[in-house]
Structure formats: C-alpha cells, structure tokens
Swiss-Prot record:
Identification of the protein by name: Probable DNA-directed RNA polymerase
Main location: mitochondrion
Subcellular localization, as worded in the UniProt entry: Mitochondrion
Family named by the database record: Belongs to the phage and mitochondrial RNA polymerase family.
Recorded GO CC terms: mitochondrial DNA-directed RNA polymerase complex
InterPro entries reported for this sequence: DNA-dir_Rpol_C_phage-type, DNA-dir_Rpol_phage-type, DNA/RNA_pol_sf
Pfam families listed in its UniProt record: RNA_pol
GO terms under biological process: mitochondrial transcription
Reaction it catalyzes: RNA(n) + a ribonucleoside 5'-triphosphate = RNA(n+1) + diphosphate
Keywords associated with the record: DNA-directed RNA polymerase, Mitochondrion, Nucleotidyltransferase, Plasmid, Transcription, Transferase
Organism whose genome encodes this protein: Neurospora intermedia
Entry EC number(s): 2.7.7.6
GO molecular function: DNA binding; DNA-directed RNA polymerase activity
Record's function text: DNA-dependent RNA polymerase catalyzes the transcription of DNA into RNA using the four ribonucleoside triphosphates as substrates.
Length: 811
C-alpha cells in the first residue's frame, strides 16, 4: 500500500439509491489534506517521470537516435502488454516512486473487483482487466482526448482498446480475428462503453477526482479538476504515436507499412489512411501520393528554444493569458511545453497520415504544425537561412498577419503589412506585454518578435521560423475555377488587379443581415431578429464551411460556439439541467438574448440566404446533389477521380441509435450509442458529396504542389507554410498547380462523363424526351423516369489569368 494511499479495506455496507453497494471507508481529513497539498503547491519545474525517462533515453542515445526511437516505442509496448511482469524501463520509476493518480486509480480497480462490482463483466475478460497497465492506457487516452470527445466516445475507445489488448495477448490463437472473438462473446458497442466507463470511473470517483463528469447541451463530457493540475503534469503518460519521432519515419509504399518503427496501433492494422472504420470509403493510393507522404515525413524540425525559454520566464504572461481566457486548453498547453522541453536538444520528425479523400493530417498530438498556436510556434525548421530581400519582405508580412489588430491586416496589401512592421519596429523589439497580448496570435507573434531581436543584432542571423499564408475561402476558390465564374473568382482573389485584398466574407454579410432583419416580420414573427447585426468574426467560419455544404445544425453549433453565453438552470422531468441563452449583437451595439431554438431559427435563415448573390453556386450544389440521389436510387457506388489520379469511392453506412443505461456504484447514466450496419446512409451520402469532392480537390491541389516542391512545406489544409525565403516561389507554385488543376483537367465534364459511363456499365438506359435526358428505371409496376442533372453553365474566367492576377490567392 502506498505511503499516502488513503484506501483501507474495512468494507462498510451502505445503501445508495435503494441499491445495496459496498463502499470503501476512508479518512476524509487525510483525503482533504492530500487535495490541498496537490492544488496549492506551485508548478514543479521538473518533467514528469515519464517524460524524464524519455529525455534520458534521448540523451543516452544522442549519437544513434534511431536506436532511441526504437527503445521509446518498445518500452511503450511493454507497458501496453498485459501479460508481462517486467516493468517497462520508460515507466520503471513510476512503479517505484509515489504515483498518487495511478495508485489511487489502480486501488479503485482492485476494490471494484473485491467488492463484486465487476461480476457482470464477461468471463473472458474478468480475470484480466485488473491490470495496472490498463490504468496507464486509459490515462493516456483521457489526457489526449478528454477535451475533444464526449464521455460516451471515451468510454467506447477505452473499452474497445482494452478488450483488443486482452484478445491480442490471450485469445489471438483461438479466434481468426478480433471480430470473431467479439461476436463469440457478444461484445457489442454497449459492452465496450460499460467496460470503458469502469476505467474512467477510477479517475472520476470521489476518491480520485481528477476529472469531473459534466452534462451540458444534452451531452456528457469530462473536464479537468483544476485542483489536480499539478498532479496531472507529474503523472503524464503519452503514447509514442502522439509524440514526434527522433529518426526519419519508415517510408510508406504499396503493401509496405511506414511511419513509426513498430506497429503501435491497438485497434487495427496500422494504415496510412486514418478515419472512421465504420464506413466503407475507398481510396486507391497512387505512387505520387506515397512519395508526397514520404517527403513530408522526411522534413527535420527542432524546438524554438528562444521561445520556450521566453514563455517559461519573462513571457509567462502569455500562458497565464491563455489560462484565464481559454481555460480548457491550459493542461494541453502545459503538456506541449513539457514535450518541447523534452525534445529541446533533439531534432525530430512529424509523421503524417491521410484520410480517404487524400487530405493530409499530422499524427503527433501535442507538438505539430497542424495543432494549437502554441504547438506551431514552438516548431522551427531544422535548417535555417539568412533572409534574402524577398524572405525579409514575407517575414514582415507574416508578422503583420499574426498580429492582425482585430482583423485589419488581412484586407491590406502585402506592402501595407510590411510597412506596419517597419513602423512598429520599436514596439516589436521591446516586446511590451500589452503590445504582445493585442496580437491575434500572441505566441506566434512572440516567436516573430524574438527573431526580430536577433535580426536587429545581426542581419545575417539564420532564420528558422516557418511562415504561413492562407487561401481565401479555398472551397469557393475551387467552385469559381470549376464554374469559370469570373465574378466569384474576383471575390476570392483568384483574379485581383488591385493592391487591396478582396474580402469574400465581408461582401456577403450585408445581404445576410438584411435577410435576418426582414424575416422578423415576414416569416418568423420574431421582432428580436429585426435589429440583429452579425459581424465578420461570427460569420466567417459559417460562410467558409457553407462552401462545404454545412447543414443548419452545423451553422447552429458554430454560432453557439462564438456567441457569448448566459447560463441558466431549468427543470426537466424533475431534474435540474444547465442550459444557455445567447447574446447576439444588434445594430446599435447592444445585444438581444436568444434561446437555443431561436439560434436554430437564426441559423436556418442564414443557411437559406447565404449565397443568394451567387446563383451559380446554387447550380453546382444542385447538380452534385441530384447526381448523388440518382446514384443512390440505382444503388451504384458513388465514385470519382481527382485530377492527380486518385480513385475515390464514398460509402457511408447507416447508423442506428439506442440508449443504454449504465449503472455503476449506484449511479445511473444514460448513454446514447451509435452502431453501424451494412446499409447505405442515403441522407448522408447526398449531404456529404459536396464537401468530400471539394476536400478531395484541395488534397489533389496540395499533392501536386508538394510533389513539385524541393524545399520545406508545411501543409495545414488550405494554409501553406515554408521558410520566408521560399514563400514567394511557393505562392507562385500554389497558383501554377491550381491553374494546372483546372486548365488541363475539365473536372465537371469528367464527372458527368464518368456518371453516364457508369450508367452504361450497369445497363441503365438513358432516354431523351423533348430535349431532356432521363434515366429509365424499372419499377414494381411500370418504368420510372428520373431527369438527369444538367451541368451548370460555364462562365468567362480564364484560369491562366490567375498566374499574374492571383497575387492574393493566398495571403
């Protein structure tokens, strides 16, 4: 028993909620003292035991980092293997030194078994689940995903992972597959959720309240108990998949596994393609895409040591600022800082994967260029360069971009942004606290300022910071080029002969607000809407995602995440439930208060009116959705080819929802479970066709750029990063590949041609009536005729003009 353990085994029978349960009898004063000790002590500057051991491995094998990476991965596998009695070196000190969080969680798990709380677990698992290593697995899942997953999803992932581990270690020789093992034992979604909930309970129990279960907006989730922040940082356990690699990842190829040196995946065979395995999407990966992934994986990075030191000393006010304004990200920020400290003197690589559409995602969780602002700011290119004239210019432009001063700079010319930095050099070098915190991205701007200090001291200083430029609503850029719509192309800066940046979002806002105001009397009889005036910050993401066919529900959720909330308690079925009203800005600078239903109504108005200025957008939406409906009606796979040769097939399986009551230790919780069946989800097939095609075109464009690029490139979907010296050429390459995408590849005509060829292959007859084509389908009693969608009329945009007039295509 641990020295500080406050468990004892004097079991006392108590009743709770009319259920006879066994509870532990413990010393509450001792418990309170331990809580106070944990919450009041200052942040220990030492790394967690886990990261300290990783650091030791890196130090001991700094001349052979391939060996270091292999040791880190193998030690993790030892930790995750249930049967071994050998302690993993990477966590050996965690077994021998005091570990409050893990000790308490494991003591609770043992207690649940001794009290009979695990009796309902399957016999196949019951004898194996009380294993300390599963506590570590659950803990690592919780740390990585608590802030972005529902409680039920966490339950499922942990329960599934632990079951998979037990199958691999004890039952793999008895069953052909994990699915056979699960089917034989009748392990369904509900079983995995209940098993996972037992392990999560070891971290939410009053005896180990590291996380708090909260119920908001009809969803259970977890929040960090702030009293235990220090203890959490001391108890970090992180899978190598969530960490950078210190040697080049293995190359991927046809039938060849790449990435980590060892297969670390516990749920399925490791694959380059990640995403939901509940559906049956397909991608035929080309040699070009494999080459692109391997090129990205080979880029070497290092920690921005100047920024790390600054944040831990005089710049700690930035982390305090995030702690006060974005409290839910504080722990992740602290973990990111500690990982950066661990890898400070070691070069590293960042694994990437793709989804079935070819979109590229970084695998590392806390330290990666697609992650948080802090994560991005701490990453430097391993190879620096002295800034040339264009490099200095774009470095200054980037500095203005990340300061942005309330969105002012994103609409200004590159020269105006450059001039702003020149005019504010004294403030930039001084790095005054108030000046830094006014930046839109304070951490990135601090990194910029620190480099500017170095450049002032030595103009020949080699710069290691990557810089980034963003596309202007890339989804609409693709539609404009696809439709050759000149007006739309101007709005999204494909064609721009001036020196100011066209702001697509601001162009749409007046019409959207007018529609909202007019709806107050005409349709919804809600006078609250008559004075509403939504601004750019509220509508930018809505407009951007509408080009990907976001639904009214999606718009509602986006608005709710942006609007200021007012909490209130309502009584529903005899229970108190926390709900929110929302403060919506008005024309006179005040607010109106809308409830959730009214926000949904507001979202509906926006959805119906958002693109009224651009009828051709409606025509392409109509064409693609009608195409999808015919594919579904004929039960033909919905597939298309991207311009760079990817063959993609979209297939969403239907999900069924049921409610499961989880009863553990006398407490009930209702979980909503989703299970998938091998039937097409017709609604989602139609709804998803537009975003999936656009995402695949984004991916195709990026693949073409990376394949033809010889320097660093850091892709963040529609955002492009590289060394400042290379940004001018990269911007040119972005335009050239976009022109190639749409000048030599008539995408819409090819989709239409393939659609008609598919009909022929499936012996579907096309008939013409009065100049209109119909698909002839044999029904139960008679033939049915479905009108074929007609391609939208093309406009007058010459995509070749983008080369010279698309300067602000990315800005």
């Amino acid at each position: 028993m641990s020295k500080f353990s406050f468990f004892n085994y004097r079991i006392n029978m108590r009743n709770s909620h009319a259920t006879s349960l066994r509870f532990i009898k413990f010393n509450y004063s001792e418990f309170k003292n331990i809580r106070n000790f944990s919450s009041e002590k200052k942040r220990d500057p030492k790394l967690s035991l886990f990261l300290n051991n990783v650091s030791k491995i890196l130090s001991e094998h700094k001349k052979d980092l391939h060996k270091a990476q292999e040791i880190i991965e193998r030690e993790w596998l030892k930790l995750a293997t249930p049967s071994t009695d050998v302690k993993s070196d990477i966590t050996s000190t965690m077994y021998t030194k005091h570990r409050l969080i893990h000790d308490r969680a494991f003591d609770l798990l043992k207690l649940y078994k001794s009290n009979g709380n695990l009796n309902k677990i399957s016999k196949s698992l019951k004898d194996y689940i009380v294993n300390e290593k599963f506590i570590f697995i659950a803990w690592s899942y919780l740390l990585a995903s608590y802030s972005k997953s529902s409680l039920t999803n966490l339950d499922y992932r942990i329960g599934y992972s632990i079951t998979r581990h037990i199958y691999t270690e004890y039952y793999k020789d008895e069953f052909m597959s994990f699915d056979d093992f699960s089917n034989y034992n009748k392990f369904d979604v509900g079983f995995f959720v209940k098993l996972g909930d037992i392990f999560i309970n070891t971290f939410t129990s009053p005896l180990n309240p590291i996380f708090e279960r909260v119920f908001e907006n009809e969803i259970y989730s977890l929040k960090i108990n702030k009293e235990y922040e220090n203890e959490i940082m001391e108890s970090l356990v992180i899978s190598p998949k969530a960490l950078p690699m210190v040697c080049p990842p293995l190359p991927w190829g046809h039938g060849i596994r790449g990435g980590n040196l060892i297969n670390l995946t516990d749920t399925q065979d490791e694959s380059l393609v990640v995403g939901s395995f509940h559906h049956r999407h397909k991608i035929a990966i080309t040699d070009k895409l494999y080459n692109v992934i391997n090129k990205l994986n080979a880029f070497k990075f290092k920690i921005n040591g100047d920024l790390l030191s600054y944040l831990q000393n005089e710049g700690s006010f930035i982390l305090d600022f995030y702690k006060n304004t974005k409290k839910d990200t504080y722990i992740n920020n602290m973990i990111t800082i500690d990982i950066a400290r661990t890898y400070l003197n070691t070069p590293f690589y960042l694994n990437v994967n793709i989804d079935w559409r070819g979109r590229i995602y970084t695998q590392s969780f806390y330290l990666d260029y697609q992650g948080s602002e802090l994560s991005l700011a701490l990453i430097n290119l391993f190879e620096g360069k002295k800034l040339d004239e264009k490099g200095l210019f774009f470095f200054y432009v980037y500095g203005a971009n990340i300061y942005n001063d309330g969105g002012k700079f994103s609409k200004k010319s590159f020269q105006d942004r450059f001039n702003w930095v020149v005019e504010n050099l004294d403030n930039i070098i001084a790095m005054d606290k108030e000046f830094i915190l006014k930046a839109e991205s304070p951490t990135l701007f601090a990194a910029f300022c620190l480099t500017m200090r170095k450049l002032k001291e030595n103009p020949d200083y080699p710069v290691f910071n990557p810089i980034f430029l963003d596309a202007t609503c890339s989804g609409v850029q693709h539609f404009a080029a696809m439709l050759l719509d000149l007006e739309l192309g101007k709005y999204v800066n494909l064609i721009n002969s001036g020196e100011s940046v066209n702001d697509f979002y601001s162009q749409l806002i007046p019409a959207i607000n007018k529609a909202i105001n007019e709806s107050a009397e005409k349709k919804f009889k809600n006078l609250k809407f008559s004075d509403i005036s939504l601004n750019r910050s509220l509508l930018k993401k809505v407009i951007m995602t509408k080009s990907y066919n976001v639904t009214t529900y999606g718009i509602t959720e986006q608005l709710k995440s942006k609007l200021e909330k007012v909490e209130k308690i309502v009584i529903s079925k005899g229970k108190e439930i926390k709900v929110y009203d929302y403060l919506v800005p008005t024309k006179n600078g005040d607010f109106v208060v809308l409830d959730t239903f009214e926000v949904e109504t507001l979202a509906s108005i926006i959805n119906d009116n958002i693109f009224n200025q651009f009828p051709k957008l409606h025509s392409i939406y109509d064409y693609l959705t009608r195409l999808a409906k015919i594919y579904l009606k004929l039960d033909i796979p919905l597939s298309w080819s991207t311009p760079d040769g990817l063959e993609l097939t979209q297939r969403y399986n239907l999900s069924k929802v049921k409610k499961l009551t989880i009863n553990f230790l006398g407490k009930n919780r209702t979980a909503v479970l989703r299970s998938w069946v091998n039937e097409k989800d017709s609604r989602r097939e139609v709804q998803a066709i537009i975003p999936n095609i656009i995402h695949s075109l984004d991916a195709s464009h990026l693949t073409m750029i990376i394949d033809s690029w010889d320097s660093y490139i850091l892709p963040i979907h529609e955002c492009f990063g590289t060394h400042p010296n290379d940004m001018y050429k990269l911007a040119e390459q972005v335009r050239e590949c976009f022109i190639l995408l749409y000048s030599k590849n008539d995408f819409l005509n090819k989709i239409d041609y393939k659609f008609r060829e598919n009909l022929k292959d499936y012996k579907i007859e096309i008939v013409n009536k009065n100049g209109e084509d119909f698909v002839k389908i044999k029904g139960n009693k008679r033939y049915e005729y479905l009108p074929l969608p007609v391609l939208p009329q093309m406009g007058e945009l010459n995509v070749e003009d983008i080369r010279d007039m698309g300067k602000y295509m990315i800005s």
